[in-house]
């Protein structure tokens, strides 16, 4: 196996996906990258003749070209993402450059080290060389005439001076867990021929390859690992701004921008008040990549305050300009989503300003003074006091609201005001789905439907007749067809309707034979219906024969 790695050089090159691709060092999740992998055997001057014959003996082939086809006609590649900050895999080169190396931890099975070095970032896929001669791209330099004569006399087949196999493949990046740091994308290259049950072949090339069977479920010869370094960036950039509209309402604007190279379909934007943190909170927590089932939870010391907050405020999402989810954001586009946080109506008086509280306080003070005077007055004078007045000045000190089980739960006003006047940080979740086709290229699912007016004609819109694809398959959406009728065509249709009605009436069994001749005569009158004469005459004759007319 060391002979094969020593004699074969591997080169990984990134290719532009489109004409506008600038091959930037910054990559985004779900971005499609195109790579070219070249396996080259360079035997200039015959320096690897002995090694080549040793490989032929190990594989059991007498022809080096056939042996090369067995090994490199098809390769199995496993993508692996490694943190660029790992010192063991930190390569001594600039970011974004190409590297080729072999990691011993991926050639042998070591469960204590493999999990910490990298993780599989995609399914295993098979790439095939460009077919030129029986399924392989082989650029072989022909031997000289003297070498051919020597081989014809029974001597050994000469080793070619150069053989090259080229593989082109697309790879879609996964979601990264790190942002703004160097990320290393490794492609673990294995021989696909060895994975077809050729255990003897695997053992002949690499006696330690049985350890790899635990990882990939089949004996595999690991040829090496090609690395590509880049800088990971976010797919969506989310920012939020909170504005106080009044003393009892707050407006929150969440701006979502697509900073990637692929369209993104925003499926849902939700505001989770349960993930609220009292106080300033952690500002670094925003913009974290989570799966659809993960949510942030509150701090243990804030559970009581969050429970009061859930029962005292309401969160209402607002639609702008008739926007409805789902919405597709093209690269560089952004969308704004708003939420209104309002205090419950029966609790708004706790947050009202002082001018609005003065009439209520003046009324409460007057009522309390009248009650005190009525209590201190003689018995004869108490009959003049209204019975609805209280006997003692009792001011409400608690705010209550029925709980779901029907009991009354009292909360002190001071505690409720402390919660409403405090600062808190909550989370807004954006559910999205990158639009990436199976071939690696992004496909736009935004479909513009043509506009249809009341008159039945098509209004100028994005889906005009010139906009349909040439393949004949129309895009999704509602379409309308335009039917133009001339006066002659309308008269023609009217004649058909009249003739059909007359025929239906005439072919009633209770009518006489004279009606048949009337129908036939009316058809002769309309010169446009010569095609209907033969069928009608046949039916008339059959009907006359049946009824003996």
Curated annotation (Swiss-Prot):
Top-level taxonomic group: Eukaryota
Misc: X92 crossreacts with PFR-antiserum (PFR = major structural protein of paraflagellar rod). X92 most likely represents a silent open reading frame in the genome of T.brucei.
Name by which UniProt lists this protein: Protein X92
Taxonomic path: Eukaryota, Discoba, Euglenozoa, Kinetoplastea, Metakinetoplastina
């Amino acid at each position: 196996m060391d002979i094969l790695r020593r004699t074969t050089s591997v080169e990984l090159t990134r290719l532009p996906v489109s004409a506008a691709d600038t091959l930037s060092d910054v990559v985004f999740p779900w971005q499609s990258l195109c790579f070219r992998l070249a396996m080259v055997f360079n035997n200039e001057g015959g320096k690897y003749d002995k090694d080549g014959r040793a490989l032929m003996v190990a594989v059991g082939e007498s022809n080096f070209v056939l042996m090369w086809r067995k090994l490199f006609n098809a390769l199995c590649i496993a993508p692996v993402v490694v943190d660029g900050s790992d010192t063991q895999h930190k390569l001594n080169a600039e970011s974004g450059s190409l590297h080729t190396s072999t990691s011993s931890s991926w050639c042998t099975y070591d469960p204590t080290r493999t999990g910490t070095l990298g993780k599989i970032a995609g399914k295993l896929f098979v790439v095939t060389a460009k077919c030129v001669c029986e399924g392989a791209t082989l650029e072989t330099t022909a031997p000289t005439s003297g070498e051919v004569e020597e081989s014809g006399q029974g001597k050994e087949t000469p080793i070619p001076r150069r053989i090259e196999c080229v593989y082109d493949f697309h790879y879609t990046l996964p979601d990264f867990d790190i942002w703004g740091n160097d990320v290393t994308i490794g492609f673990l290259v294995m021989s696909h021929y060895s994975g077809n049950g050729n255990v003897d072949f695997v053992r002949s090339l690499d006696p330690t390859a049985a350890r790899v069977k635990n990882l990939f479920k089949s004996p595999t010869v690991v040829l090496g690992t090609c690395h590509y370094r880049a800088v990971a960036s976010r797919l969506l950039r989310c920012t939020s701004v909170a504005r106080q509209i009044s003393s009892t309402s707050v407006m929150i604007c969440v701006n979502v921008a697509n900073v990637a190279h692929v369209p993104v379909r925003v499926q849902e934007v939700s505001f989770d008040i349960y993930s609220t943190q009292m106080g300033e909170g952690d500002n670094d927590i925003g913009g974290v990549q989570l799966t659809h089932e993960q949510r942030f939870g509150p701090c243990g010391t804030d559970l009581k305050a969050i429970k009061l907050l859930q029962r005292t405020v309401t969160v209402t999402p607002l639609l702008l300009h008739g926007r409805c989810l789902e919405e597709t954001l093209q690269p560089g586009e952004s969308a704004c989503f708003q939420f209104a946080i309002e205090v419950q109506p029966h609790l708004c008086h706790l947050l009202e300003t002082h001018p609005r509280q003065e009439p209520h306080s003046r009324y409460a003070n007057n009522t309390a003074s009248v009650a005190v005077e009525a209590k201190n007055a003689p018995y004869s004078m108490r009959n003049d006091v209204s019975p609805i007045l209280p006997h003692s000045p009792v001011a409400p000190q608690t705010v209550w609201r029925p709980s779901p089980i029907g009991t009354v739960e009292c909360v002190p006003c001071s505690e409720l005001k402390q919660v409403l006047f405090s600062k808190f940080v909550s989370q807004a979740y954006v559910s999205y789905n990158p639009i990436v086709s199976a071939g690696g290229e992004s496909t736009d699912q935004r479909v513009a439907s043509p506009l249809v007016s009341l008159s039945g004609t098509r209004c100028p819109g994005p889906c005009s007749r010139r906009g349909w694809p040439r393949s004949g398959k129309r895009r999704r959406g509602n379409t309308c067809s335009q039917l133009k009728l001339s006066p002659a065509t309308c008269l023609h249709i009217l004649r058909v309707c009249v003739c059909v009605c007359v025929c239906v009436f005439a072919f009633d069994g209770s009518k006489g034979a004279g009606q048949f001749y009337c129908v036939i005569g009316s058809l002769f009158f309309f010169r446009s219906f010569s095609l209907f004469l033969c069928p009608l005459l046949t039916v008339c004759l059959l009907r006359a024969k049946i009824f003996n007319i």
